[in-house]
Amino acid sequence: SGPWMCYPGYAFKVPALPGCRPVLLLQCNGSQVPEAVLRDCCQQ
């Protein structure tokens, strides 16, 4: 749960920078991405 939930064809709820999208897509594809990495990436 939380802001990083994934949906088909929609990788994230929050606005993400272009550089952040691949990281979120990795998580949506089943990879374990630390939440801190996502926060650091998306809040730049």
UniProtKB/Swiss-Prot annotation:
Gene3D superfamilies: Plant lipid-transfer and hydrophobic proteins (1.10.110.10). The disulfide bonds are essential for the inhibitor activity. Endosperm. GO terms for cellular component: extracellular region. This is Alpha-amylase inhibitor WDAI-3. Keywords: Alpha-amylase inhibitor, Disulfide bond, Secreted. Homodimer. Belongs to the protease inhibitor I6 (cereal trypsin/alpha-amylase inhibitor) family. GO terms for molecular function: alpha-amylase inhibitor activity; serine-type endopeptidase inhibitor activity. Its main location: secreted. Disulfide bonds join C20-C41. It is found in: Secreted. The keyword Signal does not apply. It comes from the Eukaryota. PROSITE patterns: CEREAL_TRYP_AMYL_INH. Alpha-amylase inhibitor.
